[in-house]
Swiss-Prot record:
Molecular function in Gene Ontology: ATP binding; hydrolase activity
Catalyzed chemical reaction(s): ATP + H2O = ADP + phosphate + H(+)
Entry's family note: Belongs to the actin family.
Keyword flag Cytoplasm: yes
UniProt-listed InterPro entries: Actin, ATPase_NBD
Predominant subcellular localization, coarse grouping: cytoplasm
Gene3D superfamilies, sorted: 3.30.420.40
Name of this protein: Actin-1
Organism: Pseudotsuga menziesii (Douglas-fir)
GO CC, one annotated term: cytoskeleton
EC number of the protein: 3.6.4.-
Coiled coil regions, renumbered to chain: none
SUPFAM superfamilies: Actin-like ATPase domain
Length: 45
């Protein structure tokens, strides 16, 4: 899984999930629907 304990640990797999979600589930073009990704301020680096 690309997320461990709420933190993205594998960005390549996470991008594949986003690609599938935008194109196959939502059926929208990601360049027309921006997403703001944030992280908690106390996440470990």
């Amino acid at each position: 899984y690309p997320i461990e304990h709420g933190i993205v640990s594998n960005w390549d797999d996470m991008e594949k999930i986003w690609h599938h979600t935008f194109y196959n589930e939502l059926r929208v073009a990601p360049e027309e629907h921006p997403v703001l990704l944030t992280e908690a301020p106390l996440n470990p680096k």
